[in-house]
């Protein structure tokens, strides 16, 4: 029995699902599976932009099997997929079924996604997988059910082969976040192109081009969906790559160079950070003079006591990277595989033969001497891309998160080694953290990224902050029209990531546009921005007040001013300002209580 879609003339319906004859329950499962796969496909349309949020897609279908509306999360901080879908469906949402690739990510008191489904009159919700983060898992499902909405989760409420395949598609589109929830390293993909005889270059080192133009376009798409691209020093020396996504808009990944000796050329395409940043990771103490040269070009250098793929990936895990694309040579690839940090392999095999006993292969020595030791890929896929064959598969399976929901009767054991009078520390950084919403760059769907906006203002005292949107609604006294243009682009950016990219690029390309007194006023500006944010969202204020007696630390390993640093050496000004704001709110509460009691 098959399910197909055809265009429907009944506006505003988009398409109609047509079922062939067969068992009703099987048809039911097939319909659910098809719409869940569609939701998963939708969620991937903004891959790379939604981080640190998951990829969300939503399809609204009527009882007759028609798609009434659909939507996907464009980027972190934009309108939820569920809200977009019910807006598109309009009156057809009432009594309909909503298909979600993942449980709604409503968190930190923001119930936009769930509220949209409830208010639209959705009767049933089918969820591909529960939210992978422990502190969010099951919350939205419980809330939906509390409103009388039927909620089914694939693999829990019913099972079948077709539903299992649909569930797998949901796991695939959010594999990076799922891996983060279960491990301490980002989801890593090893990508390479090789000839039919297994060579990634000729004996001379020449490698342009092994694969076809179509395959290289797919590589750009892979980069655009990754947080970072990593190469070794040899790749920089021989190929001088740019490692850009080359799509002209949206997400551009960070470039990472991993080199033990720091034996790198003084001039390289990767040292141009006007559009995208570059991070060089190396052994501690390596070529200090060259480190200074890189720093003068705007390249960040991070030193390690023991430079190896595992340590490097754990570091970038702390920095909040979800997905890494490895485009390195065979030596580094072998080291990464041996360190168990590679989860997936994507290989483009070209119908060419180059030969050569010294021609490099995609993976160096792994210490294996028998074929029985070979690593077998799982969930292997084959796809023809132009003249090339794309082979992909997993070295490590995607963790299958069980719906571990704490019992209402569960008790918490007290650790006798912990001093109850010693103030505890609350770390926050990314949105997946329990208190991650405190980061100033994390916003809800109506706000804008204010850090860069205010940094580029020449007249902060004349800047007005709108309390509902946390945006500057009036800009006065700009001395340079280019600064005004930049601010307008930031103000109208669709997401905080896009706004931050505009700001970073402007600071690199036109540093003269930054207000001269920024270093003197940035703490004051940040405090006002925090007050505006917490005044706009009362639930954030309530969460802040619930942390009385704790020390708040932004766990940024690389920002030594706003964050706590890699080893606690940072100044943690963001955490300090939050604690100052908490004290201010507590003072206001005390004054209010005194007035009430005196009355």
From Swiss-Prot:
**Reaction(s) catalysed by this chain's protein:** 5-amino-6-(5-phospho-D-ribitylamino)uracil + NADP(+) = 5-amino-6-(5-phospho-D-ribosylamino)uracil + NADPH + H(+); 2,5-diamino-6-hydroxy-4-(5-phosphoribosylamino)-pyrimidine + H2O = 2,5,6-triamino-4-hydroxypyrimidine + D-ribose 5-phosphate; 5-amino-6-(5-phospho-D-ribosylamino)uracil + H2O = 5,6-diaminouracil + D-ribose 5-phosphate
Q: Which UniProt keyword terms apply here?
A: Chloroplast, Glycosidase, Hydrolase, Multifunctional enzyme, NADP, Oxidoreductase, Plastid, Transit peptide
Q: For this protein, what is the EC number?
A: 1.1.1.193, 3.2.2.-
Q: State a single Gene Ontology molecular function.
A: hydrolase activity, hydrolyzing N-glycosyl compounds
Pathway, per record: Cofactor biosynthesis; riboflavin biosynthesis; 5-amino-6-(D-ribitylamino)uracil from GTP: step 3/4
- Biological processes, Gene Ontology terms: carbohydrate derivative metabolic process; chloroplast organization; FAD metabolic process; response to high light intensity; riboflavin biosynthetic process
Is-annotated flag, keyword Chloroplast? yes
Looking up SUPFAM superfamilies in the UniProt record yields: Cytidine deaminase-like, Dihydrofolate reductase-like, YbiA-like
Instruction: Enumerate the Pfam families for this protein.
Output: dCMP_cyt_deam_1 (PF00383), NADAR (PF08719), RibD_C (PF01872)
* Origin superkingdom: Eukaryota
- What are its GO cellular component terms? chloroplast
Localization annotation: Plastid, Chloroplast
Q: Keyword Translocase on this protein?
A: no
Describe the family membership recorded for this protein in Swiss-Prot or TrEMBL.
In the C-terminal section; belongs to the YbiA family.
Q: What else is known?
A: Unlike bacteria that have a bifunctional, two-domain RibD enzyme, plants have a monofunctional reductase and a monofunctional deaminase, each having an enzymatically inactive domain.
Q: What is this protein called?
A: Riboflavin biosynthesis protein PYRR, chloroplastic
Species of provenance: Arabidopsis thaliana
């Amino acid at each position: 029995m098959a399910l197909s879609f055809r265009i429907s003339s009944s506006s505003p319906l988009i398409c109609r699902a047509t079922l062939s004859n067969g068992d009703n329950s099987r048809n039911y499962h097939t319909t659910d599976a098809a719409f869940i796969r569609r939701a998963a496909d939708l969620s991937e349309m903004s891959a790379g932009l939604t981080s640190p949020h998951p990829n969300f897609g939503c399809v609204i279908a009527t009882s007759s099997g028609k798609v009434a509306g659909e939507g996907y999360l464009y980027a972190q901080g934009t309108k939820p997929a569920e809200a977009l879908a019910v807006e598109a469906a309009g009156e057809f949402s009432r009594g309909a079924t909503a298909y979600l690739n993942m449980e709604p990510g409503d968190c930190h008191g923001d119930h936009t996604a769930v509220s949209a489904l409830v208010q639209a009159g959705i009767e049933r919700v089918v969820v591909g997988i529960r939210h992978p983060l422990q502190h969010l898992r099951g919350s939205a499902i419980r809330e939906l059910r509390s409103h009388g909405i039927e909620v089914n989760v694939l693999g829990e409420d019913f099972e079948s082969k077709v539903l299992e395949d649909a569930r797998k598609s949901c796991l695939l589109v959010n594999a990076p976040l799922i891996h983060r929830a279960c491990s301490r390293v980002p989801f890593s993909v090893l990508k390479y192109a090789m000839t039919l005889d297994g060579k990634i270059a000729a004996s001379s080192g020449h490698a342009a081009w092994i694969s076809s133009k179509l395959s290289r376009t797919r590589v750009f798409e892979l980069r655009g969906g990754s947080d970072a691209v990593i190469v070794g020093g040899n790749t920089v020396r021989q190929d001088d790559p740019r490692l850009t996504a080359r799509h002209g808009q949206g997400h551009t990944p960070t470039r990472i160079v991993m080199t033990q000796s720091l034996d790198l050329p003084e001039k390289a395409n990767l040292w141009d950070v006007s559009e995208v940043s570059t991070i060089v990771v190396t052994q501690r103490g390596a070529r200090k003079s060259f480190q200074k040269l890189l720093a003068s070009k705007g390249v960040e250098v991070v030193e390690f006591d023991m430079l190896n793929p595992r340590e490097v990936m754990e570091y970038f895990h702390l920095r909040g990277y979800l997905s890494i694309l490895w485009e390195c040579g065979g030596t580094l690839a072998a080291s990464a595989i041996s360190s168990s940090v590679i989860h997936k392999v994507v290989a483009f095999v070209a119908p060419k033969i180059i030969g050569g006993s010294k021609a490099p292969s995609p993976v160096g020595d792994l210490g294996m001497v028998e074929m029985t030791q070979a690593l077998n890929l799982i969930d292997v896929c084959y796809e023809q891309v132009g003249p090339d064959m794309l082979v992909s598969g997993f070295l490590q399976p995607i963790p299958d998160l069980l719906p571990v929901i704490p019992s209402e009767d569960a008790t918490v054991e007290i650790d006798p080694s912990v001093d109850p009078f010693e103030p505890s520390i609350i770390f926050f950084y990314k949105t997946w953290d329990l208190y991650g919403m405190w980061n100033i760059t994390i916003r809800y769907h109506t706000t804008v990224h204010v850090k860069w906006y205010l940094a580029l203002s020449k007249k902060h005292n004349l800047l007005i902050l709108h309390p509902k949107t946390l945006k500057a609604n009036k800009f006065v006294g700009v001395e340079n029209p280019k600064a005004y243009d930049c601010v307008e682009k930031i103000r109208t950016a669709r997401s905080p990531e896009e706004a931050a990219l505009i700001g970073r690029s402007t600071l690199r390309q036109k540093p003269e546009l930054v207000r001269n007194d920024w270093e003197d006023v940035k703490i004051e500006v940040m405090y006002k921005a925090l007050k505006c944010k917490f005044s706009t969202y009362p639930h954030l204020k309530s969460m802040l007040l619930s942390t009385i007696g704790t020390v708040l630390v932004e766990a940024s390993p690389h920002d030594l001013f706003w964050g706590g640093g890699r080893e606690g050496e940072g100044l943690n000004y963001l955490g300090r300002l939050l604690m100052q704001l908490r004290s201010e709110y507590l003072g206001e509460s005390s004054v209010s209580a005194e007035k009430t009691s005196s009355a």
